[in-house]
Amino acid sequence: KEINSIYLNISWSDLGSWSEIFKILKSKIKKSFIKKNTFYRPWGLYRNYFRGENFLLKELIINRNSSISLQKHHYRSEHWTVSGGKPKITIGNKVFFKNPDETIFIPKGSVHRIENIYKKPVKIIEAQLGSILKESDIVRYKDIYGRIK
């Protein structure tokens, strides 16, 4: 099927070509997508990038001297890839220090945490796998921000 009209909420300009229109569309979609899918937390932020059946791809950014809760999930496992910084990761009673391009797997039901003890932000690409992929699937054990209920 052909599309013969596209609504753009932009100011008037002489675009000149379809490639210019696609550049504007791409930039608008990217900005609105990122803004809509960015969620701020006391430790930093996360962005949801892609959701499929039984999986979710996210980016976590943990600020310096911050950490996520010591927590577990009943319905999902997680696979983390470090894309920036040097996180301190706790899984059960084991502690790992990771570097960019290194990965770690968090099995469903495992107590875990990411800490940033350095100045540079920690960036993690998180792949969640499971039957329920909601923020409500968090059981917190320790939280420096007082979020344990």
Give the positions of each predicted feature.
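Double-stranded beta-helix
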Residues: 113-149
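Left-handed beta-helix
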Residues: 1-105, 110-113, 117, 133, ...
